[in-house]
């Protein structure tokens, strides 16, 4: 600034403001030779006069007047002093320092000629008593009635008085803004908010922060120097970078509320001025904050309310929306609600991770091992999940869930093992083709849906029960490839109304999975099958000594369902999309919209053979939902007739006498099953095997491989899931623990029979 001045003096000037420390408030002058005006360093009086070119230079936004932002600051360097605020170089100064041995007077007109019409000057007086060394600064009192505000400079007082007169004459011309300010400088600073300009950068090594005003930079630098404003109240350790913020905080201890609303006798008082401004808008109806989103015309009285509203737009923009666009109600796009996002992964994510999986093929895993792992005591080892998968899903679902619990990272490879189960909701509409998909890893029972439209039936759908996470036996090591078990989209196939899964004779897990989840391509002949039974051998387990086999059948009991999955009919069809083994029609597949299939994965640790590291396996259980007409759910002759027809069919297919009849699905319309052969893997190109026909399957059910296959074969699916039947108490304590809150939930079926 002194570059063009007559005496070539360079001035080191710091603003006189309340937010500066006493050392910062000292005005220091050094000539170009670096000589201090007083040899003793003692200063009796300093006076600074700032010649202003425009009326007022700073809007008083804070309670105590953050002044001095408009002043030109000169900061010291190793080779001298240089000017920071180039916008204020045209302003002139008259300054003098009174010391014991000299009086130093400096007149600096600025880098440009002094203005002819000087509209005002800011006078700062700071005195130091020679005896006590105390510094005293004159305060300027506001003369408006009832206003207690004081300022250290006359210019700041004058700016403050404009607020009483409402002289907000400097208006922002940025599109959609329209804010007005007391001074031109305040407007210039505000425009930097729109332009993102931050010319004042922190020079501390490693700190890359920048600010739009020098005042904010100096406040920030106090964090580096440690010269913060600390609260001295007992038990309070808070500190602040500005004196104004400290004074606001102290009012929380004293209870002082100096800002009172005088609107129509309101009388409410506040500790901060901006709280009063916000309150006044409740009287005036002013809503100055507009939502910038396209098509949204909402306005708000506070910036906080606007930010909260904008988060809603952000969440909608980033929400997981893999649902196809239908011509139906738009509400179906948001009807899929997930309770535990950490259990969910998409088809593409599993395919991306498939290259990292190693180990055996699924065809080498026996059904006995699968069921043994499902019911082994979960206390043997800790349950872990893949945090990377959880994090990616949390980001995709950040609009649908509040939080996802953190879990320890897995230390081994992960894989996905698919077990298909059957869910049969009865509908009053005609049967529709099946679209298999993936769903939570739980064997959900079949709810009974009352008559009505499909939309009504799925408007209040049953929830799905999540199973316990159970470790796999120590004697077995699992490693499955995600890509081998990902179902591909295929044209829909009709499904048997009464399909059930029974634990019994031997069959491979892959064959069972495809038998339930993936019908084969249609052949020339079809045969109506009212019911089909597939058996699985169950490994020996101390927990299952009394219940060696498992039968999953439809049940009228829907009270055990917990609300964790809610979906509309169109979303249901999307969830059930494409799990059959081979494509039926390439043209139909090309025309079908490409969507993601969702897998709910529970990671469980697998104890490998001695000397090997522990691996992780994801148990991903697709649930097939079979739509059928309204079925009778009562224990009457119609249910018995269905059992008799199934029994007579088994007799016609095999000579051995039938075993104890297991509960069958309620009688419904006979659906045509195109073929009785099923692929062992749903992905083309993988190894496949052919399941026996329904006669052979029945024969397998009649010859169980374990002597313990007697009691559980007739277990109802409600008893299997809840294991809290009043008649048959269960020994499977880990699964019972999941249902302890069932009665508290007060869940009742909302579907009429």
Curated annotation (Swiss-Prot):
The keyword Zinc-finger applies. GO terms for biological process: cartilage homeostasis; cellular response to zinc ion; central nervous system development; DNA-templated transcription; positive regulation of transcription by RNA polymerase II; regulation of transcription by RNA polymerase II; response to cadmium ion; response to metal ion. PROSITE patterns: ZINC_FINGER_C2H2_1, ZINC_FINGER_C2H2_2. A motif (Nuclear localization signal) lies at residues 133-138. This is Metal regulatory transcription factor 1. It is found in: Nucleus; Cytoplasm. Residues 308-328, 395-466, 648-715 are annotated as: Disordered. The modification N-acetylglycine is found at residue 2. Keywords: Acetylation, Activator, Cytoplasm, DNA-binding, Metal-binding, Nucleus, Phosphoprotein, Repeat, Transcription, Transcription regulation, Zinc, Zinc-finger. GO terms for cellular component: cytoplasm; nucleoplasm; nucleus. GO terms for molecular function: cis-regulatory region sequence-specific DNA binding; DNA binding; DNA-binding transcription activator activity, RNA polymerase II-specific; DNA-binding transcription factor activity; histone acetyltransferase binding; RNA polymerase II cis-regulatory region sequence-specific DNA binding; sequence-specific double-stranded DNA binding; zinc ion binding. It comes from Homo sapiens (Human). A zinc finger (C2H2-type) spans 140-164, 170-194, 200-224, 229-253, 259-283, 289-313. The modification Phosphoserine is found at residues 5, 305. Residues 408-417, 700-712 have a biased composition (Polar residues). The gene is MTF1.
């Amino acid at each position: 600034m002194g570059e063009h001045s007559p005496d070539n003096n360079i001035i080191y000037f710091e603003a006189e403001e309340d937010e500066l420390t006493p050392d910062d408030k000292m005005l220091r002058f050094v000539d170009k030779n670096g000589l201090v005006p007083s040899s003793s360093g003692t200063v009796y009086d300093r006076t600074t006069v700032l010649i202003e070119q425009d009326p007022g230079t700073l809007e008083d936004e804070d309670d105590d007047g953050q002044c001095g932002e408009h002043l030109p600051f000169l900061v010291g360097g190793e080779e001298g002093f240089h000017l920071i605020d180039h916008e204020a170089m045209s302003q002139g100064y008259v300054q003098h320092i009174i010391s014991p041995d000299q009086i130093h007077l400096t007149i600096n007109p600025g880098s440009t000629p002094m203005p002819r019409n000087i509209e005002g000057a800011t006078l700062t007086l700071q005195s130091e008593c020679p005896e006590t060394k105390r510094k005293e600064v004159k305060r300027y009192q506001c003369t408006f009635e009832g206003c207690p505000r004081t300022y250290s400079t006359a210019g700041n007082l004058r700016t403050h008085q404009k607020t009483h007169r409402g002289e907000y004459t400097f208006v922002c011309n940025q599109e959609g803004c329209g804010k007005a300010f007391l001074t031109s400088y305040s407007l210039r600073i505000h425009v930097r908010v729109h332009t993102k300009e931050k010319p004042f950068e922190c020079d501390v090594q490693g700190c890359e922060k920048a600010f739009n005003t020098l005042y904010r930079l100096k406040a920030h630098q106090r964090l580096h120097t440690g010269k913060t404003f600390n609260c001295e109240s007992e038990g309070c350790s808070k500190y602040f970078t500005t004196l104004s913020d400290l004074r606001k905080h102290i009012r929380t201890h004293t209870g002082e509320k100096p800002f009172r609303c005088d609107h129509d006798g309101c009388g409410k008082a506040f500790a901060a001025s901006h709280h009063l401004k916000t309150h006044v808008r409740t009287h005036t109806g002013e809503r100055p904050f507009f939502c910038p989103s396209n098509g949204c015309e909402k306005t708000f009285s506070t910036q906080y309310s606007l930010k909260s509203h904008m988060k809603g737009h952000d969440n909608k923009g980033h929400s997981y929306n893999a649902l196809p666009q239908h011509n139906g109600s738009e509400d179906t796009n948001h009807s899929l609600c997930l309770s535990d996002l950490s259990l969910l992964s998409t088809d593409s994510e599993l395919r991306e991770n498939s290259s990292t999986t190693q180990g055996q093929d699924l065809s080498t895993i026996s059904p006995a091992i699968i069921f043994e792992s499902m019911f082994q005591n979960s206390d043997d080892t800790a349950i872990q999940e893949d945090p990377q998968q959880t994090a990616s899903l949390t980001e995709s679902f950040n609009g649908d869930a509040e939080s996802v619990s953190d879990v320890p990272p897995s230390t081994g490879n992960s894989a996905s093992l698919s077990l298909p189960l059957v869910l049969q909701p009865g509908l009053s509409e005609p049967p529709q083709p099946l679209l298999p998909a993936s769903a939570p890893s739980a064997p959900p029972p079949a709810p009974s849906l009352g008559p009505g439209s499909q939309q009504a039936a799925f408007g209040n759908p049953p929830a799905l029960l999540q199973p316990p996470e159970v470790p796999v036996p120590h004697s077995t090591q699992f490693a499955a490839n995600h890509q081998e078990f990902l179902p591909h989209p295929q044209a829909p196939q009709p499904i048997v109304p009464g399909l059930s899964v029974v634990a019994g004779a031997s069959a491979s897990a892959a064959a069972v999975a495809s038998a339930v989840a993936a019908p084969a391509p249609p052949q020339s002949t079809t045969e109506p099958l009212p019911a089909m039974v597939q058996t699985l051998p169950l490994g020996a387990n101390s927990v299952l000594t009394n219940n060696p086999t498992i039968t999953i059948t439809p049940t009228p009991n829907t009270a055990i369902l917990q609300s964790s999955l809610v979906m509309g009919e169109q979303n249901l069809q999307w969830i059930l999309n494409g799990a059959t083994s081979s494509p039926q029609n390439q043209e139909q597949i090309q025309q079908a919209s490409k969507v993601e299939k969702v897998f709910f994965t529970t990671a469980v640790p697998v104890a490998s053979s001695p000397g090997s590291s522990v691996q992780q396996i994801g148990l991903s259980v697709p649930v097939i939902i079979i739509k059928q007409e309204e079925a009778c759910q009562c224990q009457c002759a119609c249910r018995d007739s269905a059992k008799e027809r199934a029994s007579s069919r088994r007799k016609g297919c095999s000579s051995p006498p039938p075993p104890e009849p297991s509960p069958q699905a309620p009688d419904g319309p006979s659906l045509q099953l195109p073929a009785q052969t099923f692929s062992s893997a749903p992905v083309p190109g993988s190894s496949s095997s052919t399941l026996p026909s329904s006669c052979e399957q029945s024969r397998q059910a009649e010859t169980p491989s374990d002597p313990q296959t007697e009691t559980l074969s007739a277990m109802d699916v409600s008893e299997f899931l809840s294991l809290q039947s009043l008649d048959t108490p269960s020994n499977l304590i880990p699964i019972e623990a999941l249902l302890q809150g069932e009665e508290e939930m007060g869940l009742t079926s909302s579907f009429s029979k």
